[in-house]
């Protein structure tokens, strides 16, 4: 959530920046609401002051044995008016808060202005895409998996529906090996604290990280007495661990990681990536979350991104880093780098990780702060998150980049020990 005071002091600048994110901020409406709010607040304070003065007068009259019935009538009149105005003020404040909750984060100054993914800017590349012989072109991961009888989309469709999969045998083992490899790399080499977190979260958590109220349609919600939803990403439970907390500044930065399933309805993705593992309702990720002080937020994004990149480098998977434009960033992000891995069957790069610096946007929603003895009052932390990596997409990238002409799949060197010595899947 944006700082209301900052908005009031920088209305035109905020409107211009929000416009680059596709959000139309009605300055006149906002100013009218603020003017009305101030009027109601001033009237409330005036009535409360009158009531306090009269209450003292009642006490004085009672001490003298004088009649106070007329004054009590005036107090009752004030109380009735206060009740009406306080409700009106509350309703108006709720409306203003809903407006604030609907606003996306303001982009950092160096974020390119653009409408969609076509306006993203390439920062760097790593690795050289493998060339396939024209007579033996690269096969799609779904075809390879089905030929090996180790990826079964039909069985998943029977059990559940579309956009699910069943992994079998050595490909299931490779999927598990990947998550273990990623966790070990981040905890042993990059200094992350590993967590096991709930896969169900409450609405407060979803508001905290920005999924609600705007993206309710993307969630899988439980029916019944519990207002719980399945997590769309481990960012939600991990980041909300610091909700309503005042952290000791000396404990920052904090680096957290967790391996979880993720569940998304893909409400806006009808007809896209219907074949294969690219876009599933259920998938797994190893999530990375940083909690930092404000002055370390932007540099922490570079560090987090490098940690996600290291996974791809260890697996020798060619990729590129893209700086997202204003129109393609997620709702809560201030600045985002996407890692895109090379997929031979599509002859292009596809997203495998999104690393975002959210500034104090989520922290303001969560009331997540930090303090040390030299600070006059607690300050909002900065939050960052990224995939390190999406396990399913990494799996399909390995299947495609390590496929052999005989239909087998070579296991990357970094994963052989996690595969119990298996170096070829066939």
From Swiss-Prot:
Sequence positions that bind ATP: 264-266, 351-354
Record GO terms (molecular function): ATP binding; serine-tRNA ligase activity
Q: Which InterPro entries match?
A: aa-tRNA-synt_IIb (IPR002314), aa-tRNA-synth_II (IPR006195), aa-tRNA-synth_II/BPL/LPL (IPR045864), Ser-tRNA-ligase_type_1 (IPR002317), Ser-tRNA-synth_1_N (IPR015866), SerRS_1_N_sf (IPR042103), SerRS_core (IPR033729), tRNA-bd_arm (IPR010978)
**Sequence ranges of Polar residues compositional bias:** 46-55
Signal peptide (from-to): none
Region of interest: Disordered? 36-66
Its primary localisation, in coarse terms, equals: cytoplasm
- One matching Pfam family, short form? Seryl_tRNA_N
Nucleotidyltransferase recorded as keyword: no
Q: What class of enzyme is it?
A: ligase
Q: Which residue windows are coiled coil?
A: none
Q: Name one GO cellular component term.
A: cytoplasm
In terms of NCBIfam families, this protein maps to: serS (TIGR00414)
- Subunit description: Homodimer. The tRNA molecule binds across the dimer.
Annotated protein name in UniProt: Serine--tRNA ligase
């Amino acid at each position: 959530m944006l700082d209301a005071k900052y908005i009031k002091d920088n209305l035109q600048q905020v409107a211009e920046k929000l416009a680059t994110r596709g959000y139309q901020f009605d300055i006149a409406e906002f100013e009218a609401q603020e003017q009305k709010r101030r009027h109601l607040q001033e009237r409330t304070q005036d009535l409360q002051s009158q009531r306090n003065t009269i209450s003292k007068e009642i006490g004085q009259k009672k001490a003298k044995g004088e009649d106070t019935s007329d004054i009590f009538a005036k107090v009752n009149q004030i109380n009735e008016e206060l009740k009406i105005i306080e409700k009106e003020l509350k309703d108006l404040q709720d409306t203003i808060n809903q407006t604030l909750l609907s606003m996306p984060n303001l982009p950092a100054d160096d974020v390119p202005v653009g409408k969609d993914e076509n306006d993203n800017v390439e920062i760097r590349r790593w690795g050289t895409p493998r060339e396939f012989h024209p007579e033996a072109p690269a096969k799609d991961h779904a075809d390879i998996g089905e030929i090996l009888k180790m990826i079964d989309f039909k069985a998943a469709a029977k059990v559940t529906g579309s956009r699910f999969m069943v992994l079998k045998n050595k490909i299931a083992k490779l999927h598990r090996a990947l998550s273990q490899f990623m966790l070990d790399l981040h905890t042993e080499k990059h200094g992350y604290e590993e967590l096991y977190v709930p896969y169900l979260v409450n609405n407060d958590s979803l508001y905290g990280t920005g999924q609600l109220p705007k993206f309710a349609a993307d969630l899988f919600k439980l029916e019944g007495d519990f207002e719980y939803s399945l997590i769309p990403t481990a960012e939600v439970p991990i980041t909300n661990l610091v909700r309503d907390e005042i952290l000791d500044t000396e404990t920052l930065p904090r680096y957290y990681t967790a391996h979880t399933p993720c569940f998304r309805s893909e409400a806006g993705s009808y007809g896209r990536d219907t074949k294969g593992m690219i876009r599933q309702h259920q998938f797994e990720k190893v999530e990375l979350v940083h909690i930092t002080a404000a002055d370390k937020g932007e540099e922490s994004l570079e560090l987090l991104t490098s940690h996600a990149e290291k996974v791809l480098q260890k697996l020798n998977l060619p990729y590129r880093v893209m700086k997202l434009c204003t129109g393609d960033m997620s709702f809560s992000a201030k600045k985002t780098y996407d890692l895109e891995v090379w997929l031979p069957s599509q002859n292009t790069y596809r997203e495998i990780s999104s690393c975002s610096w959210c500034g104090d946007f989520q922290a303001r929603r969560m009331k997540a702060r930090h303090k040390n003895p030299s600070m006059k009052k607690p300050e909002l932390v900065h939050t960052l998150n990224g995939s390190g990596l999406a396990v399913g997409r990494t799996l399909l990238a390995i299947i495609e980049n390590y496929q052999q002409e005989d239909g087998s799949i070579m296991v990357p060197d970094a994963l052989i020990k996690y595969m119990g010595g298996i170096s070829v899947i066939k």
